[in-house]
Amino acid sequence: EFRTGEVNRVKECTYTPGGKGLNVSKPAAIAGAEVVATGFIGGHAGSYIEEALKPLGIRSAFYRVAGESRSCINIWDKKNQKQTEFLEPGFTVSEEDFSGFEKHFKELVKQADIVEISGSVPRGLDGTAYQRLVRIVKENGKKVILDTSGKLLTMGIEACPTMIKPNGDEIKMLTGRKVNRMED
């Protein structure tokens, strides 16, 4: 049982590389797809992520920046069946960093069949970040799936991704309608 304001003795800890993009990459690699993971990475946590992906069969092609990749602490309270997350802010990416990443990304896209762009972006980037990346993929004649939310999703859609993967909240944001069933 997780108790706030007290010392909590932990019985089990696991460390796994995560984030929306890597959570898509893992089952794809298990299913036999050749997967290349990219994005921004930094510091000791970034090095850990790269090493932890190797045994999963995921090729690491991250773009290194100054700072430390963020960590997420996820506490699972078995007794109450509740999850609590603590998300670090992570590093800030400059426009110069993003321009360098775009060049790196263009080279990776040339080797890809399908590109998934997902999750959030680091501080310092605006809502056009995924729009710019979707355009790069489309300019190379490749398929692109966009799985994000908020301004990144609305602006990303303007670049015409092949597919989007919105959840119920994102569908409501896009259409103004609440979705309760597949028929909606």
Show the residue positions of the predicted features.
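Short acidic, glycine-rich surface-loop motifs adjacent to enzyme active sites
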Residues: 112-124
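Glycine-rich phosphate/adenosyl-contacting loop at the front of the ribokinase-like
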Residues: 1-38, 47-48
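Cofactor-binding loop segments of dinucleotide-utilizing enzymes, especially the Rossmann-like FAD-
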Residues: 40-43, 65, 78, 120, ...
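Gly/Ser-rich phosphate-binding catalytic loop and adjacent alpha/beta segment
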Residues: 63-71, 92-97
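Anion (oxyanion) recognition and catalysis
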Residues: 29, 54, 138
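Conserved phosphate/ATP/ADP-binding segment of small-molecule kinases
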Residues: 127-184
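Conserved phosphate-binding/catalytic loop of the ribokinase/pfkB sugar-kinase fold
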Residues: 75-111
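A glycine-rich beta-to-alpha transition motif near the start of alpha/beta enzyme domains, typified by
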Residues: 34-61
